[in-house]
Curated annotation (Swiss-Prot):
GO terms for molecular function: 2-oxoglutarate-dependent dioxygenase activity; iron ion binding; S-adenosylmethionine-dependent methyltransferase activity; tRNA (5-carboxymethyluridine(34)-5-O)-methyltransferase activity; tRNA (uridine) methyltransferase activity; tRNA binding; zinc ion binding. One of its GO terms (biological process) is DNA damage response. Zn(2+) binds at H242, C341, C343, C349. The gene is Alkbh8. Residues 45-120 form the RRM domain. Disruption phenotype: No visible phenotype. Its cofactor is Fe(2+). Belongs to the alkB family. Its main location: cytoplasm. Catalyzes the methylation of 5-carboxymethyl uridine to 5-methylcarboxymethyl uridine at the wobble position of the anticodon loop in tRNA via its methyltransferase domain. Catalyzes the last step in the formation of 5-methylcarboxymethyl uridine at the wobble position of the anticodon loop in target tRNA. Has a preference for tRNA(Arg) and tRNA(Glu), and does not bind tRNA(Lys). It is found in: Cytoplasm; Nucleus. This is tRNA (carboxymethyluridine(34)-5-O)-methyltransferase ALKBH8. It comes from Mus musculus (Mouse). Residues 220-337 form the Fe2OG dioxygenase domain.
Length: 664
């Protein structure tokens, strides 16, 4: 594209559009990545949309760039939507700038991508990776022959005995078989007193004997889990339950290579290539302390020079490219533990951790009663006060809504006071909520809203282009009901439609940064106008807290003033086994009650007797709202239990776990 920078000629409509796109790309790189573009030519360029994170491979991008001259270096940071290129001369980089800006290419998934280039003073990338495997981790390449691999794969019959749930299950896009003992996913344990008939398959015997003889394992396994994964799916990060299995856990990768992510509790992440026919051995720290998981995607970032060499993926961004995943089957062997775990990692050991307060029962009836008392009734009674503290929409939710095509039909499931219903006037939005009083507030604001349950939305299947569910699903009291809520969202979407979901996070400190919920927020001089419009300083502070918090301003405390003993204290609500969470502190239980001190407006509010507390014409009664706060990876795991959806994006946003789903 030939662009007139001098302004002598009048820019065409397409040129104006291009300049806007290029400027936006420059702004996004500066804001989110700290990459500063310069206005004068240099040898180095940053290429927005040309990264591994966009599905652009090194080979494809290099072929495009070399048409402008010899490339001295092409740097492609892992999982990032941009790349750096360094040409030998400034003239060559100028040629790339003028000829490739706005160029359309097709990524490895067949989607159109437009490149936007800007000059940078220096192409650089801060290496944050670890260059060594986690202690106790071993990857052995070519541990079996191709003939042995074929025998193992052919021994798995996925069509027989599908009705027998004792050893075969379908986890949507992941098929699972158990031998020796069934692994119970709801409790992450095995029933040690109920072995499955038949033991381990005979085809595994010679391989296990070989591993024992060569010293890769010390104990012969008695439990086997076989998983089959389609490209694009993975496993949430987890640690195999300490009390269920012994130290050694080994896994064979068959059919396709994969990159597995290992993460230390302090935040260090290591990506490890598991080649086809390789053996992964986890012992000691890597087994007990580090989480392991597989990110759901169709391509892995690998080293270009050694694509399928086992071991750590180095952080050399001059040698990274994409590798397409295939159908992978894993054989994971474990030894069931018979004695209590006495490992050195008590902070993550289910046996050694300090006992937590009892949680709720899984009974559907009791779950419904809990939700009725500590969610439905409470929000109906605090609706007016709650609405007065909810004005400011969250930027990334606004971004999602504004990116939708004009005329899209969008459902806000659990819309509250409707603060997102009017964000984009070009959309047809409808809201629903379980609270009649909150729906009435929506109608007063001229929004379309109705009363219904999020598990049974009276809207035709496949009729929505998009849905949002903001701070709703964490109010359901069982894992099954939370998955049902996700399934209902998926039912509403047309094929290709997207859903944005926010839930409150257990991790209120993430990547060494405390959420605004823990930090609180001082009122600055610039906030006077909003403060003056609020009924109190406390209400202003509430509006600055994370989306899922809905915090009671009257109970806000400085987390630094809470002692360790007070943090663990389990205050109880009458007739409830759930602990009351202390606001502005970290969570120590996933199932909690969060207080709300109701402020009444004598001229408007009716004197409502709170159903969540005994006693009562208290002018400032306390209500307790039920929450299930989600751990890292839990929301993605719940989404994977839903059929016909794929996870487009997952991220952390100020104390909330968030995903974008797409109906397939």
């Amino acid at each position: 594209m030939n662009i007139n920078h001098k302004g002598v000629l009048k820019l065409t409509k397409m040129e104006k559009k291009f300049l806007r796109k290029q400027s936006k790309a420059r702004h996004v790189l500066l804001k989110h990545e700290g990459i500063q573009a310069v206005s004068y030519p240099t040898q180095s360029l940053v290429i927005a949309n040309g990264g591994l994170g966009n599905g652009v491979s090194r080979k494809q991008l290099l072929l495009t760039l070399e048409k402008c001259g010899p490339v001295e270096a092409l740097l492609m940071p892992p999982n990032k939507p941009y790349a750096f290129v360094i040409f030998q001369t400034i003239e060559e980089s100028k040629k790339a700038y003028f000829t490739l800006n706005g160029k359309e290419i097709i990524d490895d998934l067949g989607q159109k991508i437009f490149l936007y280039l800007n000059f940078v003073e220096k192409a650089q990338w801060k290496n944050m990776g670890l260059e060594a495997l986690p202690p106790g981790l071993l990857v052995v390449e070519e541990i079996i022959s191709s003939e042995e691999e074929k025998k193992l794969l052919e021994s798995v019959n996925w069509t027989e005995d599908t009705g027998n749930q004792n050893f075969q299950r379908s986890l949507k896009h992941r098929r699972v078989k158990h031998f020796g003992y069934e692994f119970h996913y709801e409790s992450n344990t095995v029933d040690k007193d109920k072995p499955l008939p038949g033991g381990l398959p005979e085809v595994c015997s010679s391989i296990l004997e070989k591993l024992l003889k060569e010293g890769y394992i010390k104990h012969k396994p008695d439990q086997l889990t076989i998983n089959q994964y389609e490209p694009g799916h993975g496993i949430p990060a987890h640690i195999d339950t300490h009390s269920a299995f012994e130290d050694e856990i080994i896994s064979l990768s068959l059919g396709s290579a994969i990159v597995m992510d290992f993460k230390h509790p302090e935040g260090v992440t290591v990506q490890v290539m598991l080649p086809r026919r390789s053996l992964l051995v986890m012992t000691g720290e890597s087994r007990y302390l580090w989480t392991h998981g597989i990110t759901p995607r169709k391509f892995d970032t690998v080293q270009a020079s050694e694509q399928f060499k086992g071991g750590i993926i180095t952080s050399d961004i001059g040698d990274l490219t994409l590798s397409k995943r295939g159908m992978r089957t894993s054989f994971t062997f474990r030894k069931v533990r018979r004695m209590p775990c006495n490992c050195s990692y008590s902070s993550v050991c289910d046996r050694q951790r300090k006992a937590t307060p009892p949680s709720l029962t899984e009974s559907s009836k009791e779950a419904l009663e809990l939700e009725q008392k500590h969610v439905h009734q409470v929000y109906n009674e605090i609706a007016s006060h709650f609405s007065s503290t909810r004005h400011s929409p969250w930027p990334r939710i606004v971004e999602f809504l504004k990116a939708l095509p004009s005329g899209s039909i969008v459902a806000d499931i659990g819309c509250g006071n409707g603060k997102y219903l009017g964000i984009n006037k070009d959309l047809y939005m409808i809201g629903c909520d379980r609270s009649q009083n909150l729906v009435d507030i929506c109608r007063e604001r001229q929004f379309q809203a109705l009363v219904c349950d999020a598990l049974a939305v009276p809207v035709r299947s496949g009729s929505c282009d998009a849905c949002i569910s903001i701070a709703v699903i964490h109010h359901f009291a069982t894992a099954e009901r939370r998955v049902e809520a996700l399934q209902e969202l998926a039912r509403l979407l047309r094929p290709g439609g997207q859903a944005l979901i926010y839930v409150w996070a257990m991790e209120q400190e993430y990547k060494n940064q405390k959420s605004k919920y823990l930090r609180g927020k001082r009122i600055s001089q610039g906030d006077k106008d909003e403060l003056n419009s609020a009924t109190s300083t406390e209400e202003f502070l509430v509006n600055q807290t994370p989306e899922g918090v809905n915090e009671d301003p009257a109970l806000s405390v400085n987390s630094s003033s809470i002692t360790k003993e007070e943090e663990y204290k389990s205050r109880k609500v009458p007739n409830s086994e759930l602990p009351i969470h202390i606001n502005r502190t970290c969570f120590h239980s996933q199932d909690v009650l969060v207080p709300w001190h109701l402020k009444r407006n004598p001229g408007k509010d009716k004197a409502i007797e709170p159903s969540g507390v005994a006693g009562c014409p208290d002018p400032s009664p306390v209500f307790h709202r039920y929450y299930h706060v989600f751990c890292d990876g839990e929301l993605e795991a719940s989404c994977q239990a839903v059929g016909d959806v794929s996870i487009l994006q997952s991220y952390y946003d100020q104390g909330n776990w968030c995903v974008v789903l797409q109906k397939v």
